[in-house]
């Protein structure tokens, strides 16, 4: 037999390597936390919160972050801030100098602050996070709604009045029932006492008559 027959064929070797890597457990993916919707008043400053949980500490040499904006779900995303060893503010024309990084990657916080919010800022804000050796990229999505005025608070005066009236009525009813119960109990006790006295007086009269008959 030729000695080369004992050597593994390349195809078998590649198959073995593929099987080996398929058995290696993948890195656990990170979890990103961000509000689904954020309503802010026109002209105010707002913080776009985005935090993440990772099984690994942040290595600034490998960690990366992208913040993007899009007007609608199907619209093109525009990157306005990123982290590559340091924070890089791309200063899009729509935002200018109004975007400020307010997070701390070492504390798993990559939030940004948007100053002097305008109506044109309404839309979708995405934060994309990569933290090797986590293999999967984390994604947080926030829909920013810009309001012209603060929505009016619901008037709860009527509810308070109704609740107080019902509570007062129930208190009066309970008080009346307690008074009636006390009065009835006192009457029952008085009747029991009177019956007991009558019974004792009858016994005493019977004993007196018996003594008179003996004499």
Swiss-Prot record:
GO MF entry, a single one: voltage-gated potassium channel activity involved in ventricular cardiac muscle cell action potential repolarization
Membrane topology: Single-pass type I membrane protein
Extracellular-side segments: 30-157
Major location (coarse): membrane
Residues marked Binds SCN2A (site): 56, 135
Positions with biased composition (Basic and acidic residues): 189-215
GO cellular component: axon initial segment; node of Ranvier; T-tubule; voltage-gated sodium channel complex
The entry's keywords: Cell membrane, Cell projection, Disulfide bond, Glycoprotein, Immunoglobulin domain, Ion transport, Membrane, Phosphoprotein, Signal, Sodium, Sodium transport, Transmembrane, Transmembrane helix, Transport
Transmembrane segments: 158-179
UniProt-annotated stretches for the region Disordered: 188-215
Signal peptide: 1-29
Glycosylation sites noted in the Swiss-Prot or TrEMBL record: 42, 66, 74
Residues in compartment: Cytoplasmic: 180-215
InterPro entries: Ig-like_dom, Ig-like_dom_sf, Ig-like_fold, Ig_sub, Ig_V-set, Myelin_P0-rel
Residues where Phosphoserine is found: 192
A single BP term in Gene Ontology: sodium ion transport
Disulphide-bonded residues: 50-127, 72-75
Ranges where the Ig-like C2-type domain occurs: 32-154
Subcellular locations according to the entry: Cell membrane; Cell projection, Axon
Family per similarity comment: Belongs to the sodium channel auxiliary subunit SCN2B (TC 8.A.17) family.
Function text: Regulatory subunit of multiple voltage-gated sodium (Nav) channels directly mediating the depolarization of excitable membranes. Navs, also called VGSCs (voltage-gated sodium channels) or VDSCs (voltage-dependent sodium channels), operate by switching between closed and open conformations depending on the voltage difference across the membrane. In the open conformation they allow Na(+) ions to selectively pass through the pore, along their electrochemical gradient.
The protein's assembly and partners: A voltage-gated sodium (Nav) channel consists of an ion-conducting pore-forming alpha subunit functional on its own that is regulated by one or more beta subunits. The beta subunit SCN2B is disulfide-linked to the pore-forming alpha subunit. Interacts with SCN1A; regulatory subunit of SCN1A/Nav1.1. Interacts with SCN2A; regulatory subunit of SCN2A/Nav1.2. Interacts with SCN3A; regulatory subunit of SCN3A/Nav1.3. Interacts with SCN5A; regulatory subunit of SCN5A/Nav1.5. Interacts with SCN8A; regulatory subunit of SCN8A/Nav1.6. Interacts with SCN9A; regulatory subunit of SCN9A/Nav1.7.
The protein's name in its UniProt record: Sodium channel regulatory subunit beta-2
Species the sequence originates in: Mus musculus (Mouse)
Organismal lineage: Eukaryota, Metazoa, Chordata, Craniata, Vertebrata
């Amino acid at each position: 037999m030729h000695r080369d027959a004992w050597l593994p064929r390349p195809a078998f070797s590649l198959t073995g390597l593929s099987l080996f890597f398929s058995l290696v457990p993948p890195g656990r993916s990170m979890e990103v936390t961000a509000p689904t919707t954020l309503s802010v008043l026109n002209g105010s400053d707002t913080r776009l919160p985005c935090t993440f949980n990772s099984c690994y500490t942040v290595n600034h040499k490998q960690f990366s972050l992208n913040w993007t904006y899009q007007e609608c779900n199907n619209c093109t995303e525009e990157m306005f801030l990123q982290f590559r060893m340091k924070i890089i503010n791309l200063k899009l024309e729509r935002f200018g100098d109004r975007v400020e990084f307010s997070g701390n990657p070492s504390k798993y916080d990559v939030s940004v602050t948007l100053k002097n919010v305008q109506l044109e800022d309404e839309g979708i804000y995405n934060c994309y996070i990569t933290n090797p050796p986590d293999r999967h990229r984390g994604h947080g999505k926030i829909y920013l709604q810009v309001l012209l005025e603060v929505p009016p608070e619901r008037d709860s005066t009527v509810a308070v009045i109704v609740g107080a009236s019902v509570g007062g009525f129930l208190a009066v009813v309970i008080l009346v029932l307690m008074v009636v119960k006390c009065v009835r109990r006192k009457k029952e006790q008085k009747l029991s006492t009177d019956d007991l006295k009558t019974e004792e007086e009858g016994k005493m009269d019977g004993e007196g008559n018996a003594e008179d008959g003996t004499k």
